[in-house]
Amino acid sequence: MPGDQAFGQEEAALFALPPDISRCVAGRITDSERASVLTTLNEIRAAHGVPPVTYDRSSEDETMAAALMMAANGQLSHQPPTNWRCYSVPGAVGAGSSNLAGGMVSPYLAFSTSREYLVGWLTDVRNMMRGTGHRRWLLSPFVTQVAFGRVGGQTADGNRTSAAVLKTFKFASEPPPSGPVPDFVAYPFGDYPQRFYQQGALLSFSPIVDKVNRWNNLKVDLARARVIVSTAGGVVPSRIESRSNLGVGYATALEFSAGSLVAGTPYHVEITGLSYNGEPLNYAYDFTLDNSAGP
């Protein structure tokens, strides 16, 4: 099939030790792939004023085992059943504490770089459950380390498969944030690289009221929240899609839509009606999609 050889070569280049899905061998990614993932993730976090994370190599066995299960079964699950092909306890732990992507077996599957997987988690446009859960883990200032895994290649019957996993919590130890914690995390924010945005992505806002005890941030009341998005031309129609306090990323989140954003246009966002321990909270910030900030 045209392109099969190229797909296999692109997948193979990611590994220092190639995976063998038929034998349930996860393999090992290269040092350069590991470094590239960490660099890209910290580039994304920096665009939001969030401190960088470190890489926990000791957790990579979990993420590689989880990616192996997703690739072998052609599905994604945070709670994989024990009868799955290539099931393992480390893989199940990794699956339950990570962002997941891929998990598809098809002769037509296109190759995705790990950077594309990261941006996919950031935009959350293809999230199977509408919302910004993957994004909130990527951007949480209280996530201070990660581990990555991916497994892919061609199957014996000529199909293609690939899966990626990013562990963000349930580490043996979790150091404090490596830098100042912002007052809020918003998407998009500031002069924002357009390569990190995709039309159709929900906008989001998470207030950080306690920079020490992360769990206190779940007590922010969003019930009366209002969002106003505007440009120099006036108010942009917007709608709150969700008010979430489920603990994802250790913060509440407003998820809202504002139509199709235009690159180069400055947007102003006002968030009002929030409260914490009975005290009102109001926020304002600006963003512009910048298509000149790199590839």
Model-derived regions, located:
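N-terminal targeting leaders of exported, membrane, and organelle-targeted proteins
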Residues: 1-73, 144-145, 151-295
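Extracytoplasmic/secretory soluble proteins
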Residues: 14-15, 38, 64, 76-94, ...
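Surface-exposed loop/turn and secondary-structure junction residues enriched for glycine/proline
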Residues: 53-56, 79, 103, 141-142
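A short linear-motif detector with a strong N-terminal bias
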Residues: 76-77, 124-128, 183-184
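A well-ordered secondary-structure block
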Residues: 85-163
